[in-house]
């Protein structure tokens, strides 16, 4: 199994304000499969993606890539895991305002041993003619496509998309 999510539990708050957000989540995903998380606002979708991506930690349970638990990885190995295997499209795309669109996409390539061609990605996403513009010169949809380009340029094994 390429990605294993096992018994993931996460809560926020304590005492009377304690809220169980994730309660024993399991999933097994092979390379090339598509898995979609559906649920209402506040149901823990973003939290689970953040745990898979190593941005947050679970209260219990584990994430494994090719059988290796991410919790057992030292910081160097976890960074390598993120660089090699993960692309992440955040709900808020957080483009760097003083870099043009091409430079914003190319940032993702620095984290890869085998990046895709920047110009080809920009053409595919309909952004090539905007490559020298700054993020604030684009529409919200164009900015989101720039964030998608940044996530896919490193040709990740796992692409986590948060809305």
Positions of predicted regions on the chain:
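Conserved catalytic motifs of ABC-family nucleotide-binding domains
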Residues: 155
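ABC ATPase NBD coupling module
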Residues: 70-87
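Conserved ABC transporter NBD signature motif
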Residues: 61-69
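Short coil-to-helix segment of the ABC ATPase nucleotide-binding domain corresponding to the Q-loop/switch region
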Residues: 99-106
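Helix-to-loop junction immediately C-terminal to a conserved catalytic motif
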Residues: 53
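Conserved ABC ATPase signature
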Residues: 134-144
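Catalytic Walker B motif of ABC-type/P-loop ATPase nucleotide-binding domains
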Residues: 159-162
């Amino acid at each position: 199994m390429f990605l294993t999510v096992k018994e993931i539990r996460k809560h926020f708050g304590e005492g009377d304000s304690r809220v169980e957000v994730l309660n024993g989540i399991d999933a097994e995903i092979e390379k090339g499969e598509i898995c979609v998380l559906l649920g209402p606002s506040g149901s823990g979708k973003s939290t689970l993606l953040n745990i898979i991506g190593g941005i947050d930690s679970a209260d219990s349970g584990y994430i494994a890539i090719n059988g290796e638990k991410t919790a057992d990885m030292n910081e160097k190995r976890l960074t390598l895991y993120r660089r090699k295997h993960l692309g992440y499209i955040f709900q808020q795309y957080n483009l760097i305002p003083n870099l043009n669109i091409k430079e914003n996409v190319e940032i993702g390539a620095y984290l890869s041993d085998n990046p895709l061609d920047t110009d080809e990605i920009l053409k595919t996403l309909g952004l090539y003619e905007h490559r020298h513009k700054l993020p604030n010169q684009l529409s919200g949809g164009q900015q989101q496509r720039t964030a998608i380009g940044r996530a896919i340029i490193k040709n990740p094994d796992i692409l986590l998309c948060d809305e």
